[in-house]
Structure formats: C-alpha cells, structure tokens
C-alpha cells in the first residue's frame, strides 16, 4: 500500500511539473477528451530536420557501403508495390522501388498522410535505390536508405508541407533539398546508431570525494562525486542512481577532445558549452553531444583548485565502446573524465530536465527517512560528509543515505521514471524538441 501511495504521489508531482502553464489552467481539454491535431508548419527551402548533418548519429547515421545486385546485402532491400505511391522509375529497372524495410515503412506511412492532406493527390518517388552511380559519393541512395519525393500533381507549393509530413511520418532526416523535390533518409537496419540512448561508456571515470577516481559503472548510492552547482561552482554531490545502465551493450559514442581532455558520450546526452554574452561574460548552455563542433568551448575541471575552465574543442569523432551508464546526481551534473556534463539527455534544456526529475529526488529523500539504512560506507570507501558543501540549496534535500525507490540494487535498463517522463514528453512536446536518439529502443 505504501509503495502504491508513493507512486501516486510521484505521478502527481510529474504531471504538475511537466505540464505547461497553458495546459494547467483554463477550460483546456479534460482527461479522455479528444486531442486537437497540432498545427503543421511547412519546411522552409533548404531546411533540414533534425538540424544536423545527414550522416551523423543524430540523423540517419553513418554510410555503411554501396549495395549492388551482387552484394550479400542486396537481399535486405525490399520492393515497394504500394498502389498509393507513384514511382518515376526512369531507368525502367524497378530500382526506385527497392529500399530497406525501415525506409519502406516510413514511405508507406507518408503515402497515407499525403492522401489525407490533399485528397486525390498521391506521393511520388523520383529517386530510390541507385545502382548507376548518379549521386554523390557515400550517398544513402546507394544503400536503399534514401528517397527523393514530390506530390503526384508536381505542385511545388505543396513541397514544404510534404517535407513536414515526411518528418511526422518518422523519416530520420528530411531535407528540402531542391525546389523540385524533398530528400528523405533513414537509419540503417539494426544499426547501433538507432539505439544509442543517452549515456557514458562503462570505463568513463568520475572523481570521488576525498581524492581518487572511480569507473562510472562502479558507482553506488552513498558515493559523492565531483559536480557543479547552477553558478558553476564545483562541489561534491550525492550519486543517486543510474537513469540508464547496460553492462554489455556496444554503442557508438561521440568522442569530444580538447588539447588535454577527452569525453565520450552518446549523441542525445547533454554537454555544457560556454556562451559569451554581450557584456563579455560567459554563461552555461546545454547542447546535445551530436551538435558539438570543433571550436566550441566546453568546461574542464581542476579538482585541485576546484575551478572550471572553458577550453576549445579540437576534434569530434565517433567510437564504439562497451557498456552504457547514465548517472544521476543530486545537482544533475557530473564531471566525467574531467569534463563537466549534464546527467540528462533527450531534451536540450538541462534546467527543464532537472526540474522534471525533482519529484524523484524528493521521493528518494523521503524514502531515506522512512527506511533509513546503515550509514557506514561500503568496504574500501572513505566516510562521506553528512551534508553537501551547498546543503542550503534546494537541490540538496538528499543525503548519502539515499536509495532507489525500487531497490538498493537497481536493475539493468532504463529507469521506469525516465521512461515515464519520455512518454509524457512525446505527448506534450513537439517531435523536434526531443532528440531522435534520445531513448534507446529494442528495435530499429
């Protein structure tokens, strides 16, 4: 009964915090009432969604190699004979009908949207799989992962909205490439990129209180790790739990390097960059790892002086590694491999994410008082202080006694609270507000 009561209280807190003010007052729509369809905005000429390069982890992912009729991978391409789609097929070989299953699924969904948007008009494909080398090197057309589309009436005034419909249909990258067509592409079948989530690799290291470092995979409730408050002051914060943890999974990580430091994190995870104001001072801005570019300034930590320094990014690369861990601290930040990062992913507003997790932090604090556990530190660890350096701050309601609401031993996978927030986010937020790789999936 107590567990059920706690769950209901948490759910109430979540709804209170994540519901925009416009939905929290006034007549609004009641529970169970029909949702009003959201207004769709046409793409502008040369606009692409998401706003990253096509072959990056945040969009359709890496080029994996040209597929020919003699390739082993050719059998993975499937013909699309949907009668609601017109295929130009100027080569008269049927090549434009061949595509990956993911591309086919998105195209079929788009065909329905087109007929609903413009009765009597069909979706038209001008380019699909390319076996003749008509596109640029490493084009996804060579893998059957890209299509160029128009409407059957070739009314160019419709193409901006056609692009928007393609985004809504689930294409991983949509580009209003030419006034003559819209370009769309998808991730590779069963690609690692499609399941990246928001984490750090198992071997990433954090700095613990009283000196020394620890692999992120070895963190336990009661540990205090180097973190930062909202003003950029370094301090040691309570480790609460893992938002996500998978020991043996292989994932692609962005490797962001400065002249002396290197941090690895998945595409949808947030990193802090320095943003210069008009008066010359710098402020923190949270940015998806997939959007970090050479020349950006990120923050590195000096544990001896307990200060942060803005340092230029020299190189951004991709690397596959084993294990995926997303630690949550009381302050919502963590210094990983001596680089300051957010504990959050999916949405590019660190402050919103930290607020959304407030009910969980409160519930964990309450749980520590109701079910106190032995305060002695685990074997091999030095004792921790009873309070944080900034214990007067609201975010420090938690103490080193904290435990997960479910269990001291957290199961692998994404925490139920994170899954719940993600689901609520998909209901309340525009699809462009969430990173396309923000929540790991079990299928691509």
From Swiss-Prot:
Lipid-binding residues (covalent, N-palmitoyl cysteine): 25
Keyword field contains Protease: yes
Site location (Involved in auto-cleavage): 266
Site description Involved in cholesterol transfer, residues in chain: 244
UniProt KW keywords: Autocatalytic cleavage, Calcium, Cell membrane, Developmental protein, Endoplasmic reticulum, Golgi apparatus, Hydrolase, Lipoprotein, Membrane, Metal-binding, Palmitate, Protease, Repeat, Signal, Transferase, Zinc
InterPro entries according to UniProt: Hedgehog, Hedgehog_Hint, Hedgehog_sig/DD-Pept_Zn-bd_sf, Hedgehog_Signaling, Hedgehog_signalling_dom, Hint_dom_C, Hint_dom_N, Hint_dom_sf
EC number(s) reported in the record: 3.1.-.-
Residues bound to Ca(2+) 1: 90-91, 96, 126-127
Induction: By thyroid hormone.
GO MF term list: calcium ion binding; cholesterol-protein transferase activity; patched binding; peptidase activity; zinc ion binding
SMART domains referenced in this protein's UniProt entry, alphabetically: HintC, HintN
Motif (Cardin-Weintraub): 33-39
GO biological process: animal organ development; cell development; cell fate specification; cell-cell signaling; central nervous system development; intein-mediated protein splicing; neuron differentiation; pattern specification process
Pfam family, one: HH_signal
Family of the protein in this entry: Belongs to the hedgehog family.
Name by which UniProt lists this protein: Sonic hedgehog protein
Organism this protein belongs to: Xenopus laevis
